[in-house]
Amino acid sequence: MILKEEHPHQSIETAANAARQAQVRWRMAHLKALSRTRTPAHGNCCGRVVSKNHFFKHSRAFLWFLLCNLVMNADAFAHSQLLINVQNQGGEVIQESITSNIGEDLITLEFQKTDGTLITQVIDFRNEVQILKALVLGEEERGQSQYQVMCFATKFNKGDFISSAAMAKLRQKNPHTIRTPEEDKGRETFTMSSWVQLNRSLPITRHLQGLCAEAMDATYVRDVDLKAWAELPGSSISSLEAATEKFPDTLSTRCNEVSSLWAPCLCNLETCIGWYPCGLKYCKGKGVAGADSSGAQQQAQPTNYRCGIKTCRKCTQFTYYVRQKQQCLWDEXRRGELQLMQMRCARRRNGSEFGDDASATCPGGETRAATTTATITGGGAGGSGKDTTAATTTTTNKLRQLLLLVQQQMPFALWSFPVHHISQSHHQSQSQHKPSRQQKQHQHHSQVAPTSHHQSSSSTPPTPSTSSSPPSSSSSSSSSAMAAIVA
């Protein structure tokens, strides 16, 4: 159990001990102050002898002092904070800060990702609003500012997070322990449909304007959530819609499919909260036996009390409109991987590349890989020639993939070498270094003959074998293609 709540009886005893210690500290502090002023132990007040404690108890300063302490302690009890060390799926450890505000009925969760992105999640239980703020560091070498801020306001379901009152009562036994969640809730996708005008965002929640002041043009909301908030008491759909501005209806292009940095597109931003308290755990306790109206003794009924929490992990992906692709450069990083995967699948469907990863990427790859392997293994005298062609083609395709990936990741570089030159150099080198069929058969028989003779002497049936090392044509083709890339 990671975080444990205090037992009801234990919490009462703890509060009583804290009150006694505070009273003792207060009395000692004021006794020292009196001794410094050399006040006599007893004084005369209208002919009566009074003590120092009597003076403080009946003075107005003492009453004001108690009132100020109560106010300060109430504010301290209303805000509680936990620092949690969380290990993400990549094995890296980040620190989460979870703050509970009972007076405002708020919970704030904040952490910084390993790439520098600052994530802030605010949950407003009164208005059932969840705000996720992302501060992403910019790429100054590509013309971006130092950072950009986005805010996403969505409908919050009260069962997804423990209440602010329960959060304030949680205590951490070992603050330095690295936490892992008990349950993974997967990924939830939100498609935003409107901007939020922060100067009119009061009908949604009054915390939105202060939290997202740096995201004046980058605060987003969904129409579905507006309709859900309109059903709450004291809210109306007209006031909610007046605080929003809808996206253009004609755009449906993803940013990772757009080449121009100044064209509008749909951006994707994904973030994961690696650890948060998503529910409460209850323990059974012994009840107090009592008597009924007739005086008969009743059996003690077991009672349930809160004794711990359930922890979860959840990822969220937001899809929203940006006026320029320049505001969504992080979505471009997956473009090269996606295109490279599509190229591999297309070549495997044509039978031009063989590999173990074909079945994991393209549908139907297992059948094609098995058929191709069986054909190469049982090819007889022509097996080595097929291996040579397959190895040469695979090497050339990998070089082309590498060049395409570098061009996609560096759009501002001036590449004067076209990709199709690799295929041309491959055909030229293949025509120059291609041996005759008789020479290949002679080499194959010279390699297979000793093996078959040795196998016949041991009275075992011969098995067809293929050469493990690629011939010289593959190495010459690879070297010529690599020289073309370097040029």
UniProtKB/Swiss-Prot annotation:
Composition bias type Low complexity, residue spans: 423-433, 456-480
UniProt KW keywords: Developmental protein
Top-level lineage group: Eukaryota
Family, per entry: Belongs to the OAF family.
Other facts noted in the record for this chain: Readthrough of the terminator UGA may occur between the codons for 332-Glu and 334-Arg.
Function: Vital for proper neuronal development and hatching.
Protein name: Out at first protein
Source organism: Drosophila melanogaster
